[in-house]
């Protein structure tokens, strides 16, 4: 049994040249039982539309085998209305694309789990967390309910955590730091979206307990 990851840069495999940036599935290893493989097909900057149009989903589908489990998480780039190659409407093409992936995987005997987008590290002047993903998390929630597919509400989980901890403490999770900390980024980084290694570990600590509650996914984990 393998775990297949379909998504954007928050899930993408990162190498030494972008350290400390990581996609959160890179930190799943310690939680998994022996023999469980992780195949990460996620790609930076992709929406459901561009992921399908570029054939990236098809690459993963070809590798999928009966009994595998797919984690699907898009939304950060679907909202980019200025880019017709990526933009989708929340309750239209976004839901249609997600359902299309789920249906195609199901035909190969693969069960899917949807995950809403991770909250961005952006705050209002009063210190409250900004809403930065529009209707996409809710659109995914409604789709999951409609077609009876399990959902991990990562948007809600991360928003709750970030809202209950100090901004300075939360900063350590994101690629948001000053100069001279990492050789790859001598001038620092002002990134409110992507995860550092510690952030990837944090996301796994939120995701894994939720996945264990899903009967068909629980056997993946120690």
Indicate where each model-derived feature is located:
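Generic, ordered loop/turn and secondary-structure boundary motif
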Residues: 11, 33, 52, 194-196
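Glycine/Thr-rich phosphate-binding loops of Rossmann-like dinucleotide-binding domains
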Residues: 13, 48-49, 80
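Structural motif
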Residues: 47-55
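Alpha-helical cap/lid subdomain in secreted, periplasmic
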Residues: 55-201, 205-222
């Amino acid at each position: 049994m393998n775990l297949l990851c379909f998504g954007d840069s928050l899930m993408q495999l990162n190498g030494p040249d972008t350290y400390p940036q990581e996609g959160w599935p890179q930190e799943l290893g310690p939680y998994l039982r022996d023999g469980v493989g992780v195949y990460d097909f996620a790609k930076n900057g992709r929406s459901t539309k561009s992921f399908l149009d570029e054939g990236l989903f098809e690459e993963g589908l070809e590798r999928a085998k009966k009994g595998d489990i797919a984690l699907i998480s898009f939304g950060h780039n679907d909202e980019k209305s200025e880019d017709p190659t990526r933009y989708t409407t929340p309750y239209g093409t976004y839901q249609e694309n997600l359902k299309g992936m789920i249906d195609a995987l199901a035909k190969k005997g693969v069960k899917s789990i949807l995950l809403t987008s991770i909250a961005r590290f952006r705050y209002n002047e009063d210190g409250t967390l900004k809403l930065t993903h529009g209707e996409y998390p809710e659109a995914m929630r409604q789709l999951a309910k409609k077609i009876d597919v399990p959902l991990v509400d990562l948007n809600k989980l991360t928003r709750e955590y970030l809202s209950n901890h100090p901004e300075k403490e939360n900063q350590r999770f994101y690629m948001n730091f000053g100069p001279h900390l990492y050789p790859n980024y001598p001038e620092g980084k002002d990134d409110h979206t992507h995860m550092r290694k510690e952030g990837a570990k944090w996301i796994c600590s939120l995701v894994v307990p939720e996945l264990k509650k899903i009967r068909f996914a629980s056997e993946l984990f120690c």
